[in-house]
Design a protein with these regions (language model features):
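Juxtamembrane membrane-interface segments at transmembrane-helix boundaries in membrane proteins
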Residues: 1-5, 37-59, 84-99, 149-163, ...
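Hydrophobic alpha-helical cores of multi-pass transmembrane domains in eukaryotic membrane proteins
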Residues: 8-22, 61-74, 97-113, 129-148, ...
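Eukaryotic helix-linker segments that join adjacent hydrophobic helices
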Residues: 10, 32-118
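Transmembrane-helix exit/juxtamembrane "anchor" motif
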Residues: 19-33, 211, 261-284
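Juxtamembrane interfacial secondary-structure elements that flank transmembrane helices
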Residues: 19-36, 76-84, 208-218
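Structural signal for the C-terminal ends of transmembrane alpha-helices
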Residues: 20, 27, 115-117, 178-183, ...
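Non-transmembrane, juxtamembrane loop and terminal tail segments
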Residues: 36-48, 224-235, 278-307
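Eukaryotic polytopic
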Residues: 125-128, 132-135, 145, 157-234, ...
Length: 307
């Protein structure tokens, strides 16, 4: 039950963060495409004359810090639990959990510094390209930690889930690196937000496939260490059942990718409608000044006379 609750929390946090970043990215590129540049953090809009709203501008960043704190504490606490159901038993589980906790602590340090630099005038805010570079390193470390976690699992399903999660983290790392070098690359910014949403959906699917009996693939069962009373994730004893379960997970991952693409289309449409953008037919560009306007009209008249 604890594993499923944590997966639900991680899924909700990542989906909220990714969707918020996606909405802000679309809004800024639609409203001011010429001055658009990717930002690691978008504060809530400022409302003139509303002090309470202005104080809540950093609410998304505060929620991110709280989520990272919970993730860091969770990985730290479970490192003290025994887990004989992984390769290498409890010592390997302990170091693997501490490795994940260290990655979350890195993200937490960056988020806390960003909050303090936005609030206190004594701290100089870090440039956006440096923040994206740090995020790229953090996502790469998470990719490394997830890959190492997949390697020590005796559960083939959990190993495959961790492997797919690692690939999403590797994609996020690459996109952050691109944004550090090309901050005006809108496609990379939108893809980064979509990848975070995909990671959130995959965390939910991982929890359902490993810890909820109704979603466990056919022919698989929960692991249990009877002597230690330790429950693990899902294991398939028969090779045919394992291959079928892995194929089901691959299919579900593709379904989640399709859902994220649909979410991207819907979000862009709704943001464009909220920003007042409407689809129009073809038009001829208007001249910029009055002299160009008179020349434009004269050319039109001359063309009509010649015809």
């Amino acid at each position: 039950m604890g594993g499923m609750l944590y997966k639900l929390f991680a899924s909700a946090s990542l989906l909220t963060l990714g969707l918020y970043h996606l909405v802000c990215t679309f809004f800024h590129v639609i409203k001011s495409p010429q001055s658009y540049a990717a930002k690691p953090f978008y504060p809530l809009p400022r409302v003139s004359g509303n002090n309470n709203n202005n104080r809540l501008q950093k609410l998304p960043l505060i929620i991110l810090i709280l989520s990272l704190s919970v993730a860091f504490l969770h990985q730290t606490l479970i490192s003290f639990y025994s887990d004989p159901l992984v390769k290498g038993s409890t010592p390997v589980h302990r170091f693997s959990s501490l490795n994940s906790a260290a990655v979350f602590f890195l993200f937490l340090l960056v988020a806390v510094y960003l909050l303090l630099s936005e609030s206190a005038s004594s701290l100089i805010p870090l440039p956006s390209d440096l923040l994206f570079a740090l995020a790229s390193g953090g996502f790469f470390l998470h990719y490394s930690a997830a890959t190492a976690s997949a390697a020590i699992q005796t559960s083939d399903l959990q190993a495959h889930c961790d492997s797919l999660s690692a690939r999403v983290s590797a994609l996020c790392s690459l996109l952050c690196l691109l944004l550090a070098c090309r901050p005006r690359l809108f496609v990379a910014d939108a893809a980064l937000a979509a990848s975070v949403c995909l990671q959130g959906l995959w965390q939910l699917q991982t929890g359902l496939s490993l810890y909820v009996d109704g979603f466990i693939p056919e022919g698989c069962h929960r692991l249990l260490d009877v002597s230690g009373g330790v429950g693990g994730s899902t294991q398939c004893d028969i090779q045919e059942s394992k291959l079928r379960a892995v194929s089901v997970l691959d299919l579900m991952f593709t379904v989640h990718v399709v859902l994220v693409v649909i979410l991207l289309f819907v979000t862009y449409t709704m943001v464009a409608m909220a920003a007042g953008v409407r689809r129009t037919g073809s038009y001829e560009a208007l001249p910029n000044n009055s002299s160009d306007s008179s020349n434009h009209i004269q050319m039109k008249s001359l063309t009509g006379t010649q015809a």
